[in-house]
Amino acid sequence: MLSVDRDPVALTLTIVAEFATTAERVWQGWADPRQLERWGGPPTSPATVVDHDLRAGGRVTDYMTGPDGEKHHGCWRLIAVDPLRSLTVEDGFADARGQPNDELPTTTVEVRLVETPEKTTMTITSRFKSIADMAQLLGTGQEEGMRLAVGQIDAVLATTTGF
């Protein structure tokens, strides 16, 4: 199950996905940079993780390579990390050296994992600072890109024991 909800009043984009596995296995998809690369970008723009320090105060830098070969750089500033349960990051664009691009808006992204005996539910909530920021970022295809990226996790789960 995968659902996407855009709420312009709350300034949020929320993706909910369910997986027939443990929270530990889903968490590994965030904690292991090689696994994150397998689903962190849409199929047409695969992700490459450059730096990966998944702890509060840490940073993750990456880039997605588009079909035309152009690289789109990004960075996360880790705000809070509760392994196997949640993480909160400030997500933004970056330059080729991984330095934040302050000319483009950022979002606060909260990831929550809830495990039951049957499944793990992952909820990703992106919080925008303004309706203008929301319109600008969604105008880049962020919603569809995230839906496609998260939609790849089931295939990763089926082909690796670590995720």
Residue ranges with predicted function:
Residues 23-24, 53-55, 79-86, 112-121:
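A short, structured loop/turn motif at beta-sheet edges
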Residues 155-163:
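Generic C-terminal helix-cap and adjacent flexible tail
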Residues 14, 34-73, 163:
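Short beta-edge strand/loop motif at the mouth of beta-sheet-based domains
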Residues 90, 96-144:
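Beta-strand/loop substructures that line and gate deep hydrophobic ligand-binding cavities in soluble
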Residues 17, 49-52, 74-80, 106-114:
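Hydrophobic/aromatic beta-strand elements that line small-molecule binding cavities or substrate pockets
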